[in-house]
């Protein structure tokens, strides 16, 4: 569902009839830019590879991956809402100690699991408009209150203070 929802979060490029036409007001565009600037900075701060053998650390490129990062976040939120709605107010019994919401987020994380060499990490970071799988998960989830609620998280490595979070859609 997160992948399908991701494709639904393309923003201002198309009008209600599906024609390529930017339909936003200047105020809409300014508000959107303010939020996306925060998301870019969050991703720019991610060290994807530490410094090694005299080479500097490689950082994620939040500007390059912005469109896909927005789509991942929006798609995950839409998918989680659809998932909750499908339960019709019931709460399934935990499975293997995990609640339904926890399993939802674990399934999302599993979707993007990767085992790739450092050289490929460096290459993809420079040219792929998608963030690496680890960050499609961790950096996206850190902004979503429903994720924190699912795991009763109030601190720790994954925790981001509420005032630093940004939700685009």
Residue ranges and their predicted role:
Residues 11-169:
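Zinc-dependent metallohydrolase catalytic domains
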Residues 1-5, 9-10:
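Single conserved hydrophobic/aromatic residue that forms the stacking wall/gate
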